[in-house]
Amino acid sequence: MTTTETSLSADTKNGIDFKIADLSLADFGRKELRIAEHEMPGLMSLRREYAEVQPLKGARISGSLHMTVQTAVLIETLTALGAEVRWASCNIFSTQDHAAAAVVVGPHGTPEEPKGVPVFAWKGESLEEYWWCAEQMLTWPDSDKPANMILDDGGDATMLVLRGMQYEKAGVVPPAEEDDSAEWKVFLGLLRSRFETDKGKWTKIAESVKGVTEETTTGVLRLYQFAAAGDLAFPAINVNDSVTKSKFDNKYGTRHSLIDGINRGTDALIGGKKVLICGYGDVGKGCAEAMKGQGARVSVTEIDPINALQAMMEGFDVVTVEDAIGDADIVVTSTGNKDIIMLEHIKAMKDHSILGNIGHFDNEIDMAGLERSGATRTNIKPQVDLWTFGDTGRSIIVLSEGRLLNLGNATGHPSFVMSNSFANQTIAQIELWTKNDEYDNEVYRLPKHLDEKVARIHVEALGGRLTKLTKDQAEYLGVDVEGPYKPDHYRY
């Protein structure tokens, strides 16, 4: 689907507004969704536990998170617990169009008479389309009943509301600077256009929102920045730093999906190749382990000496980008930072080497610099481009335009590991919605006993049997027989 900003408009059927690629894909999406449900015991357990209680009744959740089959199970869990939901993807390439169709049609609808949830997402959005979808996700049909909860991945939905409110209070949307990214220019353009027609839209939404739950490292960083500046207008729960999210989704999910993305994108043999992983946090650990398991010769870059030492103890060389870039066959960024692989690094890469990102945003790789460099871009297939430098004749294979290759070139993390993350998201939404008066406008983490609850569900689903403490043993350790078993400062 390709449209211009001026021609974008939502479709409406059976009272549901939406914008997706193809409603006729719903049956395929529903079949995959049913399989995913069997692989997502955390979400299905929460449905059984809370279906009668309806703890999210009255919640109007605006969700910005990759519109995948696994996310479809999350959305239908939220609605099963009483919430109303509107959704958009948090990445221009990550939507699975059949999953989006299944959610709009719903379990009891048809493409002719959908009975599901409004979704605004399709694979391959332009930046203008992406931010239009984000606004639609946050714009509820009844202006007197705006969104009152946000479920976010990367912080774009939260940023749209908070920056919009900030500029409304200032009475002006600032102009874009010449060196601003293309996306920031589109973002400011959207806010400026909306300010001309409604000077209080985002303030009204911000005042209605009871809280936000954030999925990712990048989004959490944004939340802490808003809080430090005094600009966080509602409570936030940092889902990312739940142990059953960061130590599972970030590491084991990446370990699975990185290889999947490279294989689907390039069919290149990984064994024997020299691989450079930029960043050795939880995501980088999963990347390095995956590549090592394929027989690659792996090097790692790091700023933190503790992470660097961990990498070396696992047998990885710790190097700088400048030292290693010229010898690497595959380069993957996983830092959550910006300006990791710059144009001069790309020019130094081997002919036909592979470059991709599995952090969050495309600013880990200097895609803007590459586009301005005069290099010729040849599209090989969707989300696979060959960039050729005229002065050297060397070509570089870039995956997903520098955005998340595991979602752009493949289908993201597997259902079971996402069950951990999305169970945390659901619990966090319930926590903020039902106990809102216990939270200030700060960033919180879920309590340890809820983290252990999520883990316990998945241990049992895999057939594990937990040892139970005796009363004497529990007293000896200074914990309750039923947990939590570790202090908050414990490093898993």
UniProtKB/Swiss-Prot annotation:
Binds 1 NAD(+) per subunit. PROSITE patterns: ADOHCYASE_1, ADOHCYASE_2. Its main location: cytoplasm. Its cofactor is NAD(+). Pathway: Amino-acid biosynthesis; L-homocysteine biosynthesis; L-homocysteine from S-adenosyl-L-homocysteine: step 1/1. This is Adenosylhomocysteinase. The lineage of its organism: Bacteria, Bacillati, Actinomycetota, Actinomycetes, Mycobacteriales. One of its GO terms (cellular component) is cytosol. The keyword Cytoplasm applies. NAD(+) binds at residues 216-218, 250, 279-284, 302, 337, 358-360, 406. The keyword Ligase does not apply. InterPro entries: Adenosylhomocyst_ase-like_sf, Adenosylhomocysteinase-like, Ado_hCys_hydrolase_NAD-bd, NAD(P)-bd_dom_sf, S-Ado-L-homoCys_hydrolase_CS. May play a key role in the regulation of the intracellular concentration of adenosylhomocysteine. It is an enzyme of class 3 (hydrolase). One of its GO terms (biological process) is S-adenosylmethionine cycle.
